[in-house]
Amino acid sequence: MLSSSSNRPISAHLTIHYKAIQEEEGEDMRSGAGSGGHHDDYFLESNRSPTPNKKHEFIKTVLNINDNDSEFSESCSPREKLHNEGACNTDLFGDFMSKRQQRLSNSMNIYDLYQCVHNLSPSNNNHQFIARRFSDSHIPSLHHRQQQQKVTTKNFVQPTKDIQRIASYAADSDQRVKYLPNYHQSAPSTALSAAESKAAVPRKLPDRDSTQNYVLKLQLSSPNSQPMSPRTRPGYRPSCSSSNCSSSSSSSACSSVSISDPNNITAYETNNVNPQFPSNQPLDISSPCARHHHRRNSIAVKFDKALYKKTTG
């Protein structure tokens, strides 16, 4: 059974490995210090090094993951510190030194931080692992999602409407996002392939026959309307607008959109377009992302004060 402590924020610290630079010429050192310039690969330590005011070179930076337990002893509460401050400080110092000795065994390269968060598998004998939340255990991996997208693209059927969808994956999963119909048509693709597609061409103005068919569709879609041909209906006006629809004979043919305005027709068709992507597609948290769903599934890391370690040789 997994430990409940895996969902708690973890603490970590950086260990900076460095080495001293041999002074070949003292004059060059003094001239460099007087000019105030320094190289990006070197730094001047103030009070953190055994040899202050000396130049050192960075060797590597290691990320150390601490235990999930408290860094200090939990027995020393703020109220106990007021009554027994000396004893508590002694316990804190001893516990801090013991924790510091354990840091070397829980270290990794700082560039492996992202892989550590997402790829380490839990162990029943070790409660220091980093894993996903229990509610996200059903989320498939990136490889599984890529295979699923290949099947979706293979089985894609061209719809009757000319619609091209260019948006991000998060927008495809949101039912509130509407898309404008375009001239070109493309199969479901990722944001990268959609960005490489051709530019969208505006729709042409609908001709007379398409406008009449559209009015008939509006009649059939209304609950209280009867299927009637626009040519045989009395008072038929193909270019009817929303401003001159006062008569009862032409009120059934006019709707909230303007037939003479193609932009309103586009807006009406857009609101009734079903998304090509399913809304229940799993999220992929194995790729870097700054959106809300990734921050929710990430683990909070509290960084302690960095340590410095001198490398000899």
From Swiss-Prot:
InterPro entries named in the record: DUF4667
Region (Disordered): 24-53, 190-291
Biased composition (Polar residues): 211-229, 261-284
Ranges of compositional bias, category Low complexity: 239-260
Superkingdom classification of source: Eukaryota
Name of the protein in question: Uncharacterized protein YMR206W
Species annotation: Saccharomyces cerevisiae (strain ATCC 204508 / S288c) (Baker's yeast)
